[in-house]
Design a protein with these regions (language model features):
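The alpha-helix within a helix-turn-helix
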Residues: 9, 20, 49
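DNA major-groove recognition helix of helix-turn-helix/homeodomain DNA-binding modules
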Residues: 24, 41-58
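Helix-turn-helix DNA-binding elements, focusing on the entry/boundary residues of the two helices
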Residues: 5, 16, 27, 42-45
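Interfacial/linker helices and their anchor residues that mediate assembly or domain coupling
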Residues: 60-91
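A short, Lys/Arg-rich alpha-helix, primarily the initiator
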Residues: 1-11
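Short alpha-helical DNA-recognition segment
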Residues: 13-32
Length: 91
């Protein structure tokens, strides 16, 4: 998610401070999001999608991937749990 945000921002010639101002977040936090040290709160996704002129669904999918990874990556049985979730969702 963060890498894609940085890619979009740089592609549009925008500065961190411009995204920060649009989302009412400080530059340091946006930098941590781009460097994948923090996850942007979900409530900011719609405004970010509008600001960057990208489909909300694109950002939401990437955001969910990172959110899920952050939950299970430190769990010894995370992959197994994810398999059960996928199986359950396919019912």
């Amino acid at each position: 998610f963060g890498k894609r945000i940085k890619e979009l921002r740089e592609g549009k010639g925008l500065f961190l401070r411009e995204i920060g101002a649009a989302l009412e977040l400080d530059n340091a936090f946006i930098s941590k999001v781009e460097n994948e040290e923090r996850l942007l709160p979900r409530k900011h996704l719609e405004k970010l999608a509008e600001f960057l002129n990208v489909p909300l669904q694109e950002l939401l999918i990437l955001w969910l991937v990172d959110k899920i990874k952050s939950i299970i990556e430190d769990e010894e049985t995370g992959r197994q749990a994810l398999k059960f979730v996928l199986k359950d969702l396919s019912k």
